[in-house]
Amino acid sequence: MKISDLDTPVLMIDEAALDRNIARMKDLTSEAGVFYRPHAKTHKSVEIARRQIAAGAVGICCAKLGEAEVMAAGGIDNILITTAVVGESKVGRLIHARNSARIAVVADNADNIAMLGNVAQMSGQKLDVLVEVDIGQGRAGVPAAAEAAGLAKLIHDHGWLNFAGIQGYQGKIQM
């Protein structure tokens, strides 16, 4: 079959280039002595996520709960949802997805932390929560260190939540 015979639009992946890029990321992070968790928002592919994890990634980031559900259903068992999970309608979905994967979430306000605590308690499983901090882009997260510290304490003091660190996003810095 010739490329011109393909019905478009069509997704095509140069597997050799994909594997080189995954290996390069592994090498860069190994040399730096850090763990890495690639974001699946570009590829949205369970198969590519599996390859990244097989090459040393500790898990996958997903922008939304729906993406995390797809990854969990596909066997990816360590997921960070990088935007706040908000709204009662998503509570049941988050609990269900946590039955097949370790899912961590971010929060940037006390109300969201309280809701996440309820989710964890209803599921009978502690939930890892990162505080999202604004690192200068004005996009998301708490703007002040004192506020972030207060939220971290709120998470730490909750019986069903584990404070798992901080997250910041700087869209101008891409690798």
Residue positions per predicted region:
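Active-site-proximal beta-alpha core segment in soluble small-molecule metabolic enzymes
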Residues: 39-175
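N-terminal glycine-rich anion-binding loops that anchor highly charged ligand groups
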Residues: 17-48, 61-63
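Generic N-terminal amphipathic, Lys/Arg-enriched alpha-helix
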Residues: 1-13
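Short, solvent-exposed beta-strand edge segments and adjacent coil->beta transition regions
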Residues: 6-8, 33, 100-102
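Short, well-ordered helical secondary-structure segments
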Residues: 5, 23, 27-30, 52, ...
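Short, surface-exposed alpha-helical recognition segments that flank or form part
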Residues: 13-16, 104
